[in-house]
């Protein structure tokens, strides 16, 4: 059912590939509808983390309420714009933002056309039953080819795009057309204002004054200050303190009704209790069942984080707790390493998420940290029949106890200019990928589908892909189960001590090559000591590669001019004894660069 009020509301989001101008378009819409004056405008208004602006990416979902007056009849419409992240790692964030909308504006760059994430995000919008409104951006560029792109959208995605607005978000050209298209094409929300309350949390973050602020989309019912609410997945009850809308800053209102997008605060202390995707209902008149689609965020990549200065352990713990308040996808538990001391094992959504967390710890909390090599979750079937999951290579059981191991696989979709198909296929082959199929999108561009082990992707797949295709390829992936593989644990032994932080799990047939390169890399990086340091790579008890860092030595014979050979021999023997003793007590520091360079090797 639809009320008169709801007919004038449109809830929509903007989806696009990275750098196709999504956040810029959002800025222009805010400016055009007078939500922000020209003076308040800054680039990427909705990206309010410093890191987001710096990298030009959107990490957290944001929302803004625009008031649009149609020129022809003067009708006022409330347009709720929900800005979504565009990166693979934050797919779940995108899916919840989509669930809060009825329509999606699909931005396509007029010079580049459809890219892998354009497709991924567009299919996601269609799966959520949204009306997709294509918009072609950057038509002010000399290399723009809007007509070809329109055909491409129709052929590849199958959306009618003959009347797609041609805009330039940078100069503000034809922005009015986008607003008009949203009003005409995006369906108005429906929902029972009198029914039991049902609201979807599509984002939540911690404010030091208000506690957790939940960004919500109300599907049914009404919520106002004083309402007693229950979070269905967390199974906790609270009393609402304040409700309001975003203009992008907070504006307090009396109540929010079905169809509205806004925020509530209810002195919730922890972001974990207000999980994104959870359903809010009323305690006295609860909804029968929650809204569909909630799932806890799943960590795909694990890594150890250690403070460089071990006395900063408590500070690191506080930093992680504060970041976790705002990021329900981050999880961590304490762990110790012989080489690095006390630290934490953290789970991330993917590599970008991991990099961003490391940057935020270093910038916002002023802590220097070491990150160990990222690892995925392996499943190990032991000989006694038990199945365990391994996130840290050091916890892998002895080879004699393992029946078989499985590693996660992803389905990768790569779109590349046809000149580079050979190079891309070679890369996927090198990364143990299996070919699924390929199809031509247009004469010059090809879409390749591969199954690739996740372990191969988390190191440097994206960088290699970009460098092999001169930066033209785009890439998207989704988890596709597990597959059985012959895997072994590769240990690095320095001065006859295993450095647990450098251990990694590798395919059996690649262990030798990997061990060789790691030993060579470490030889270059580890500073010379006064005694020689053997660097060994081992699988189980078998040494597969060895390099030696030569000792620095003092010339003890300098003071002997001529003289007896036995005198010289005595001095050399004495030096040798000293070196031997030093080697037994000396310890070797592994510099931070060692960890980084080992991740980056091909």
Swiss-Prot record:
It holds the Pfam family GTP_EFTU. One of its GO terms (cellular component) is plasma membrane. It is a peripheral membrane protein. The keyword Acetylation does not apply. Residues 7-190 form the tr-type G domain. Gene3D superfamilies: 3.30.70.240, Elongation factor 4, C-terminal domain, Elongation Factor G (Translational Gtpase), domain 3, P-loop containing nucleotide triphosphate hydrolases, Translation factors. CDD domains: EF4_II, EF4_III, LepA, lepA_C. Its main location: membrane. It comes from the Bacteria. One of its GO terms (molecular function) is GTP binding. GO terms for biological process: positive regulation of translation. Its EC number is 3.6.5.n1. NCBIfam families: lepA, small_GTP. Belongs to the TRAFAC class translation factor GTPase superfamily. Classic translation factor GTPase family. LepA subfamily. PANTHER family: TRANSLATION FACTOR GUF1 HOMOLOG, CHLOROPLASTIC, TRANSLATION FACTOR GUF1-RELATED. Required for accurate and efficient protein synthesis under certain stress conditions. May act as a fidelity factor of the translation reaction, by catalyzing a one-codon backward translocation of tRNAs on improperly translocated ribosomes. Back-translocation proceeds from a post-translocation (POST) complex to a pre-translocation (PRE) complex, thus giving elongation factor G a second chance to translocate the tRNAs correctly. Binds to ribosomes in a GTP-dependent manner. This is Elongation factor 4. The lineage of its organism: Bacteria, Bacillati, Bacillota, Clostridia, Eubacteriales. The gene is lepA.
């Amino acid at each position: 059912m639809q009320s008169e009020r709801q007919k004038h509301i449109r809830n929509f989001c903007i989806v696009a590939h990275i750098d196709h101008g999504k956040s810029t378009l959002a800025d222009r819409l805010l400016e055009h509808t007078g939500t922000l004056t020209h003076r308040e405008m800054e680039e990427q208004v909705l990206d309010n983390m410093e890191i987001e602006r710096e990298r030009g990416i959107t990490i957290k979902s944001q929302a803004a309420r625009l008031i649009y007056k149609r020129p022809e009849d003067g009708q006022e419409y409330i347009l709720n714009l929900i800005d979504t992240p565009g990166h693979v790692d934050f797919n779940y964030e995108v899916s919840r933002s989509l669930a809060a909308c009825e329509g999606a504006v699909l931005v396509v760059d007029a010079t580049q056309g459809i890219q892998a994430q354009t497709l991924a995000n567009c299919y996601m919008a269609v799966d959520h039953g949204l009306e997709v409104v294509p918009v072609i951006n950057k038509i002010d560029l000399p290399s723009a080819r809007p007509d070809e792109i329109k055909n491409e959208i129709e052929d590849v995605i199958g959306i009618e795009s003959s009347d797609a607005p041609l805009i330039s978000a940078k100069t503000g050209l034809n922005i009015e057309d986008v607003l008009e298209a949203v009003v005409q094409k995006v369906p108005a929300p429906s929902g029972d204002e009198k029914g039991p309350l049902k609201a979807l949390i599509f984002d939540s973050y911690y404010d030091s004054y208000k506690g957790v602020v939940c960004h919500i989309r109300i599907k049914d019912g009404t919520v106002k200050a004083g309402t007693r609410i229950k979070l269905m997945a967390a199974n906790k009850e609270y009393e609402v303190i304040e409700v309001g809308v975003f203009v992008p800053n907070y504006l307090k209102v009396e109540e929010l009704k079905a169809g509205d997008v806004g925020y509530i605060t209810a002195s919730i202390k922890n972001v974990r209790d207000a999980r994104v995707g959870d359903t809010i209902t009323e305690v006295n008149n609860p909804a029968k069942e929650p809204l569909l689609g909630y799932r806890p965020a799943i960590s795909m990549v694990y890594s150890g984080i250690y403070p460089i200065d071990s006395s900063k352990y408590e500070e690191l713990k506080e930093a992680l707790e504060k970041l976790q308040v705002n990021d329900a996808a981050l999880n961590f538990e304490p762990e110790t390493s012989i080489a690095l001391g006390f630290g934490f094992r953290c789970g991330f959504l993917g590599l970008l998420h991991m990099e961003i967390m490391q940057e935020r710890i270093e910038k916002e909390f002023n802590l220097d940290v070491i990150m160990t090599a990222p690892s995925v979750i392996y499943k190990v079937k032991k000989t006694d029949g038990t199945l365990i999951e391994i996130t840290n290579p050091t916890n892998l059981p002895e080879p004699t106890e393992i029946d078989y191991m499985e590693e996660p696989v992803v389905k990768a979709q790569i779109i590349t200019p046809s000149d580079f198909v050979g190079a891309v296929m070679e890369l996927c082959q090198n990364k143990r990928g299996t070919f699924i199929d390929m199809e031509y999108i247009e004469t010059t561009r090809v879409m390749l589908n591969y199954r690739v082990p996740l372990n191969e992707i988390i190191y440097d797949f994206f960088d290699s892909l970009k460098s092999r295709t001169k930066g033209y390829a785009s890439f998207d992936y989704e988890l596709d189960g597990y597959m059985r593989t012959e895997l072994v644990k590769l240990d690095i032994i320095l001065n006859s001590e295993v450095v647990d932080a450098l251990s990694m799990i590798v395919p059996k047939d690649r262990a030798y090559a990997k061990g060789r390169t790691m030993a060579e890399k470490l030889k270059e990086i580890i500073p010379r000591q006064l005694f020689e340091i053997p660097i060994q790579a081992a699988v189980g008890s078998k040494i597969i590669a060895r390099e030696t860092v030569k000792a620095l030595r003092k010339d003890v014979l300098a003071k002997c001019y001529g003289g007896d050979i036995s005198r010289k021999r005595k001095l050399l023997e004495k030096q040798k004894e000293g070196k031997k003793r030093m080697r037994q007590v000396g310890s070797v520091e592994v510099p931070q660069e060692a960890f980084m360079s080992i991740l980056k090797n091909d």
